[in-house]
């Protein structure tokens, strides 16, 4: 399983939780399973700003949630600066490099 490390500041954390919460509400309203989104929200909330490790599924979930939030704000004529910055930081997330295949 591949994981990525995102550099996350306080603003990115806030907007990411807001985007995932919107995704959580839509999934819950439609009756679809939303436990994975809920666990990710709680994990991000418990993480201090700095580096956030995301698995491949979590990365895709966060990317899609931020993109949906950005699209909603564009449709309503709102500002997308915070969502754009968080999405850019998420897309720049790196796959960790382990020298000789060893994890630290």
Task: Mark where each language-model region is.
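Positively charged, low-complexity terminal tracts
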Residues: 1-104
């Amino acid at each position: 399983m591949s994981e990525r490390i995102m550099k996350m500041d306080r603003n990115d954390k806030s907007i990411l939780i807001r985007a995932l919460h919107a995704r959580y509400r839509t999934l819950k309203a439609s009756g679809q399973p939303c436990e994975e989104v809920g666990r990710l929200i709680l994990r991000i909330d418990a993480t201090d700003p700095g580096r956030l490790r995301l698995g491949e599924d979590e990365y895709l979930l966060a990317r899609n949630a931020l993109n949906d939030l950005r699209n909603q704000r564009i449709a309503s004529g709102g500002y997308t600066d915070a969502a754009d910055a968080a999405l850019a930081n998420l897309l720049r997330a790196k796959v960790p490099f382990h020298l000789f295949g060893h994890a630290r």
